[in-house]
UniProtKB/Swiss-Prot annotation:
Enzyme Commission number(s) of this protein: 5.6.1.7
Catalysed reactions, semicolon-separated: ATP + H2O + a folded polypeptide = ADP + phosphate + an unfolded polypeptide
GO molecular function, one term: ATP binding
Region called Disordered, residue ranges: 525-547
Protein name: Chaperonin GroEL
Assigned keywords, A-Z: ATP-binding, Chaperone, Cytoplasm, Isomerase, Nucleotide-binding
UniProt-listed InterPro entries: Chaperonin_Cpn60_CS, Cpn60/GroEL, Cpn60/GroEL/TCP-1, GroEL-like_apical_dom_sf, GROEL-like_equatorial_sf, TCP-1-like_intermed_sf
Transmembrane listed as a keyword: no
Bias-annotated ranges (Gly residues): 532-547
Gene: groEL
Cross-referenced Pfam families: Cpn60_TCP1 (PF00118)
Length: 547
């Protein structure tokens, strides 16, 4: 086991503060509309330019192991805030640095760190309650666009395109971000349910120019097994032919004479059909077939529920207004399923999302919700160079997270004002002793810090602005982008409540742990053995080896 170095008390705390300051100082230059960029070196390719706090934090690794521990603790604040709210990472870092800095002064003065921590926790609980009172629902498209713009560093174009995407696919819809091919941002929307399986034979194509099979008001047959024998299919094909409607078959696979017969019937115009493989694999395939059945008002023909292909009736088939089948995708538009049944299915999948343990499962379940509840929107980010593309894409993703958070928990005035407005309520909270009161004071001071940093990044005098904003009430604040004072909500400077709340809670949580640290243990750096660094000429460099 390698030898360890142990530091205690003030020596340990000083190292932690140094690490916290290095990371926080690098991150906080990005805060606000006039925040600066940070350039991150890459071992290959062009460097990355970013204004995203968590991206900067993740890059920082310090040589001194004790300082590095401090930096890693604050990195955790940024990462946790990014995971829960998707934005607010820089605010969280600024808050954590302030709480640690102020707190260490009180610890050095001889106060009890545990009581300071309890005071900090009381203040944060009070501030969160006050934030909830300040919060108002984010419902209009205009507000969604404003939240998106602020999160994307005052880029109104990004805010607009996100609001448009949410309008099209609903608040539950999936919005994905991809690299575009031009200079402009583009929005593609897929309405209805789309899954990544295309036609099994090009002979099903009905529109030669678009290369798709378009079925108007079709029946949908869902089967969880492979279909090879045409005899199994004949009864249902005859019923569909009598009804005079097209048929889409979704099964594990369709091949052999079954596929050949369907193709021949299609070419001759006897019965318009199309066959596709069921999406997904294993249990996920069963679940997705069930989703399609609920969406189209049909039933999955499966042996385990006592249904067979030969005995299938028209009532077992699903229906839709239109289905388009391409080479790689199938889109079901306006399925005939019962709205209440669809809502119940969505609620059931949401419950599974809450219980899902892996991010992959959660993502796949979220996609299923979107396909049932809304649709899928694709934002294609346009840029002139790859470096700009990466930076812009990261901002779009940030803005997307922020707008989702705003829809979830509402919005508060932005620009660091929401935290300032909680100061009155928090200052009335009393601790159990003098040290706890000091803990509350630490948070009161920290809650000014985001606004101070925004103003500092603009090149203005922070104390003057903070005092002027404190004199105002409600949504009155400082718009750093224009340098004006006024009603921030009217100006469109908004923050999601969830982002502000998460930033404060996560910052206080980690800062509290740092303040109550009294000993640190780290591995001693390995010393090079003598002679190991010498040249290899005549094997002289091997002097450190035992022969």
């Amino acid at each position: 086991m390698a030898a360890k170095e142990v530091r205690f008390g003030d020596s340990a705390r000083q190292a932690v503060i140094s690490g916290v300051n290095v990371l926080a100082d690098a991150v906080k230059v990005t805060l606000g509309p006039k925040g600066r960029n940070v350039v991150l070196e890459r071992s290959y390719g062009a460097p990355t330019i970013t204004k995203d706090g968590v991206s900067v934090a993740k890059e920082i690794e310090l040589k001194d192991k004790f300082e590095n521990m401090g930096a890693q603790m604050v990195k955790e604040v940024a990462s946790k805030t990014s995971d829960t709210a998707g934005d607010g990472t820089t605010t969280a870092t600024v808050l954590a640095q302030s709480i640690v800095k102020e707190g260490m002064r009180y610890v050095a003065a001889g106060m009890n760190p545990m009581d300071l921590k309890r005071g900090i926790e009381k203040a944060v609980t009070g501030a969160v309650e006050e934030l909830k009172k300040l919060s108002k629902p984010c419902s209009t498209s205009k507000e969604i666009a404003q939240v998106g713009s602020i999160s994307a560093n005052s880029d109104t174009e990004i805010g607009r395109i996100i609001a448009e995407a949410m309008d099209k696919v609903g608040k539950e819809g999936v919005i994905t971000v991809e690299d575009g091919s031009g200079l402009e941002n583009e929005l593609d929307v897929v309405e209805g349910m789309q899954f990544d399986r295309g036609y099994l034979s090009p002979y099903f194509v009905s529109s030669a120019d678009k290369q798709i099979a378009a079925l108007e008001s079709p029946f949908v047959l869902l089967h969880d097994k492979k279909i090879s024998n045409i005899r199994d299919l004949l009864p249902v094909l005859e019923q569909v032919a009598k009804a005079g409607k097209p048929l889409l078959i979704i099964a594990e696979d369709v091949d052999g004479e079954a596929l050949a017969t369907l193709v021949v019937n299609n070419i001759r115009g006897i019965l318009k059909t199309c066959a596709v493989k069921a999406p997904g694999f294993g249990d996920r395939r069963k679940a997705m077939l069930e989703d399609i059945a609920i969406l189209t008002g049909g039933t999955v023909i499966a042996e385990e529920v006592g249904l067979s292909l030969e005995k299938t009736r028209l009532e077992d088939l699903g229906q839709a207004k239109r289905i388009e089948v391409g080479k790689e995708n199938t889109t079901i538009i306006d399925g005939a399923g019962d709205v209440k049944t669809i809502e119940a299915r969505v609620a059931q999948i949401r419950k599974q999302i809450e219980e899902a343990s892996s991010d992959y499962d959660r993502e796949k379940l979220q996609e299923r919700v979107a396909k049932l509840a809304g649709g899928v929107a694709l934002i294609k980010v346009g840029a002139a160079t790859e470096v700009e593309m990466k930076e812009k894409k990261a901002r779009v993703e940030d803005a997307l997270h922020a707008t989702r958070a705003a829809v979830e928990e509402g919005i508060v005035p932005g620009g660091g004002v929401a935290l300032l407005r909680t100061i009155n309520a928090v200052s009335k909270i009393k601790g159990d002793n003098h040290d706890q009161d000091s803990g509350i004071k630490i948070v009161l001071r920290a809650m000014e810090e985001p606004l101070r940093q925004i103003v500092t990044n603009c090149g203005d005098e922070a104390s003057v602005v903070v005092n002027k904003v404190k004199e105002g009430q409600g949504t009155f604040g400082y718009n750093a982008a224009t340098g004006e004072y006024g009603d921030l909500v009217a100006m469109g400077v908004l923050d999601p409540t969830k982002v502000t709340r998460s930033a404060l809670q996560n910052a206080a949580s980690v800062a509290g742990l740092i303040l109550t640290t009294d000993a640190m243990v780290a591995e001693l750096p390995k010393e090079d053995s003598p002679g190991a660094g010498a040249g290899m000429g005549g094997m002289g460099g091997m002097g450190g080896m035992d022969m």
